[in-house]
């Protein structure tokens, strides 16, 4: 008898993470050295040396924290790295300095007025460091005794905790027992307990218990047993924005509005009271004001009322540094009939310092495309990269970078791990750039519906033209 062989097939499926590849996910800073000199290529930034050096000076102003209420305009043609400079600036600032990024069209809403949307954006960009002294219990756990009731009542227990100088036994309530169980605290752990909130933080295991375990995970951390008194006073710094304080004090549901997003209109009286209180905290040394950055992309989409509000807001005591980006030349300011540089009123331009960006050359485009391919985990051959660089020069950098992921899918279809020249050519023929799309529209313009509603169906001898009647709104058909 022949034994039947049993074969098993194991399928594994990779889980997609939350960190998706975005347009500027490869940027980790401005690419400057300690002397604010820009590197040719660094931290994901390529070229634009003058603009990056100017942004580095702005970075030092922000980090000093003494200058606020300044306006910076980043102007340049499309696809020259204006938003990338702002993203690099935010990466260099870190999490301590508030950075708010909005688009010019975001402030137009049916629920909020334009000035309220701008005010909230300004207030989000101002941070407040509030200093608070709290009592902490810090020591090494010697023993935990938990008594569970047979009838299912409240648990009771005792916690023996020590430092190098003293040892104390604490009575535990139901809440503290649940906290210790949740943190999986055992004898030999060094813990910290906030007396005000009852929050338990596990700092690590004591060095004296290092030999009690034969095997330990990589996350296991050994620390020294604390010295001195068990109860200590520590200064804790909380960083919040002015907008968060506004929301908490303006609505009945308080901080829950921060999660729902339903902040609504906040009265000016509430903001005035908060400003007065924050000024008092600053004088008493309880709080420190951190001027942040408000980045407004496509700033030419704002109208004259918004620009007037920004002019006034920049003179306020609580004003961040406002960085604006635009790709417009001499164009109309929205809400007016006159033209101005970059679509901004002259009084706001006069208050701004302007950073210009220039188009990339071939070498810079090649380096940027190589960085994007590395970020998207796409392997490009030399010929494919050369063709992509040429496409980026003749069309736009965005179009060339978009072809990378498309070409990868075409390469995978022919079971290849690297993107070659035919893959780039095929994706170039499948997906049009803006210039070829305009040529297509001009060639078949009669077959598209125009502003008057006219369209021609068919070609050559037999064609039907449909027009919209101006007088009674009826459709009319004409046959050639």
Curated annotation (Swiss-Prot):
<protein>
    <recommendedName>
        <fullName>RuvB-like helicase 2</fullName>
        <ecNumber>3.6.4.12</ecNumber>
    </recommendedName>
</protein>
<dbReference type="InterPro" id="IPR003593">
    <property type="entry name" value="AAA+_ATPase"/>
</dbReference>
<keyword id="KW-0010">Activator</keyword>
<comment type="similarity">
    <text>Belongs to the RuvB family.</text>
</comment>
<comment type="function">
    <text>DNA helicase which participates in several chromatin remodeling complexes, including the SWR1 and the INO80 complexes. The SWR1 complex mediates the ATP-dependent exchange of histone H2A for the H2A variant HZT1 leading to transcriptional regulation of selected genes by chromatin remodeling. The INO80 complex remodels chromatin by shifting nucleosomes and is involved in DNA repair. Also involved in pre-rRNA processing.</text>
</comment>
<dbReference type="Pfam" id="PF06068">
    <property type="entry name" value="TIP49"/>
</dbReference>
<keyword id="KW-0547">Nucleotide-binding</keyword>
<dbReference type="InterPro" id="IPR042487">
    <property type="entry name" value="RuvBL1/2_DNA/RNA_bd_dom"/>
</dbReference>
<dbReference type="InterPro" id="IPR010339">
    <property type="entry name" value="TIP49_P-loop"/>
</dbReference>
<keyword id="KW-0067">ATP-binding</keyword>
<dbReference type="GO" id="GO:0097255">
    <property type="term" value="C:R2TP complex"/>
</dbReference>
<dbReference type="InterPro" id="IPR027417">
    <property type="entry name" value="P-loop_NTPase"/>
</dbReference>
<dbReference type="InterPro" id="IPR027238">
    <property type="entry name" value="RuvB-like"/>
</dbReference>
<dbReference type="GO" id="GO:0006357">
    <property type="term" value="P:regulation of transcription by RNA polymerase II"/>
</dbReference>
<keyword id="KW-0698">rRNA processing</keyword>
<keyword id="KW-0156">Chromatin regulator</keyword>
<dbReference type="GO" id="GO:0043139">
    <property type="term" value="F:5'-3' DNA helicase activity"/>
</dbReference>
<keyword id="KW-0347">Helicase</keyword>
<dbReference type="GO" id="GO:0000492">
    <property type="term" value="P:box C/D snoRNP assembly"/>
</dbReference>
<dbReference type="GO" id="GO:0005524">
    <property type="term" value="F:ATP binding"/>
</dbReference>
<comment type="subunit">
    <text>May form heterododecamers with RVB1. Component of the SWR1 chromatin remodeling complex, the INO80 chromatin remodeling complex, and of the R2TP complex.</text>
</comment>
<keyword id="KW-0378">Hydrolase</keyword>
<keyword id="KW-0234">DNA repair</keyword>
<dbReference type="GO" id="GO:0006338">
    <property type="term" value="P:chromatin remodeling"/>
</dbReference>
<dbReference type="GO" id="GO:0031011">
    <property type="term" value="C:Ino80 complex"/>
</dbReference>
<dbReference type="GO" id="GO:0016887">
    <property type="term" value="F:ATP hydrolysis activity"/>
</dbReference>
<dbReference type="GO" id="GO:0000812">
    <property type="term" value="C:Swr1 complex"/>
</dbReference>
<keyword id="KW-0227">DNA damage</keyword>
<dbReference type="GO" id="GO:0043138">
    <property type="term" value="F:3'-5' DNA helicase activity"/>
</dbReference>
<keyword id="KW-0539">Nucleus</keyword>
<feature type="binding site">
    <location>
        <begin position="76"/>
        <end position="83"/>
    </location>
    <ligand>
        <name>ATP</name>
    </ligand>
</feature>
<dbReference type="GO" id="GO:0006281">
    <property type="term" value="P:DNA repair"/>
</dbReference>
<keyword id="KW-0805">Transcription regulation</keyword>
<dbReference type="InterPro" id="IPR041048">
    <property type="entry name" value="RuvB-like_C"/>
</dbReference>
<dbReference type="GO" id="GO:0006364">
    <property type="term" value="P:rRNA processing"/>
</dbReference>
<dbReference type="Pfam" id="PF17856">
    <property type="entry name" value="TIP49_C"/>
</dbReference>
<keyword id="KW-0804">Transcription</keyword>
């Amino acid at each position: 008898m022949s034994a039947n062989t049993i074969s098993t097939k194991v399928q594994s499926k990779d889980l997609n993470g939350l960190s998706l590849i975005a347009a500027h996910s490869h940027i980790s800073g401005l690419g400057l050295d300690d002397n604010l000199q820009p590197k040719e290529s660094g931290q994901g930034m390529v070229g634009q040396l003058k603009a990056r050096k100017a942004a580095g000076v702005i970075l030092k102003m922000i980090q000093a924290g003494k200058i606020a209420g300044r306006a910076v305009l980043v102007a340049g043609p499309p696809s020259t790295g204006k938003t990338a400079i702002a993203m690099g600036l935010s990466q260099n600032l870190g999490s301590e300095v508030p950075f708010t990024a909005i688009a010019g069209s975001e402030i137009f809403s049916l629920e909020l007025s334009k000035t309220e949307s701008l005010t909230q954006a300004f207030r989000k960009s101002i941070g407040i460091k509030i200093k608070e002294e709290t009592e902490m219990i810090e020591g090494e756990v010697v023993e935990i005794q938990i008594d569970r009731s047979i009838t299912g009542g409240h648990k009771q227990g005792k916690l023996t905790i020590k430092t190098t100088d003293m040892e104390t036994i604490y009575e535990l309530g139901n809440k503290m027992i649940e906290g210790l169980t949740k943190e999986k605290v055992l004898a030999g752990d060094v813990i910290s307990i906030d007396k005000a909130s009852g929050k338990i933080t596990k700092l690590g295991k004591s060095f004296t218990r290092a030999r009690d375990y034969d095997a330990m995970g990589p996350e296991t951390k050994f620390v020294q047993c604390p010295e001195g008194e068990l109860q200590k006073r520590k200064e804790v710094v909380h960083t919040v924005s002015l907008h968060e304080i506004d929301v908490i004090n303006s609505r009945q549901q308080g901080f829950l509005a921060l999660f729902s997003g339903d902040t609504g209109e906040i009265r000016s009286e509430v903001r005035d009271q908060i400003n007065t209180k924050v000024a008092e905290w600053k004088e008493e040394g309880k709080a420190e004001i951190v001027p942040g950055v408000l980045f407004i992309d496509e700033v030419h989409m704002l109208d004259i009322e918004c620009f007037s509000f920004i002019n006034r807001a920049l003179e306020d005591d609580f004003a961040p540094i406002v960085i604006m980006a635009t790709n417009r030349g001499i164009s109309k300011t929205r809400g007016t009939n006159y033209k101005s540089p970059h679509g901004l009123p002259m009084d706001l331009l006069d208050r701004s310092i302007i950073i210009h960006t220039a188009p990339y050359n071939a070498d810079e485009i090649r380096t940027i495309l190589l960085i994007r391919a590395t970020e998207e985990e796409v392997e490009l051959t030399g010929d494919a990269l050369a063709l992509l660089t040429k496409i980026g020069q003749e069309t736009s950098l965005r179009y060339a970078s978009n072809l990378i992921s498309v070409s990868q899918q075409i390469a995978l279809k022919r079971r290849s791990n690297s993107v070659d020249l035919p893959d780039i050519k095929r994706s170039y023929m499948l997906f049009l750039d803006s210039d070829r799309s305009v040529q297509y529209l001009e060639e078949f313009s009669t077959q598209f519906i125009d502003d008057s509603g006219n369209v021609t169906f068919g070609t050559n001898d037999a064609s039907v033209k449909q027009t919209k009647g101006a007088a009674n709104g009826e459709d009319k058909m004409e046959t050639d």
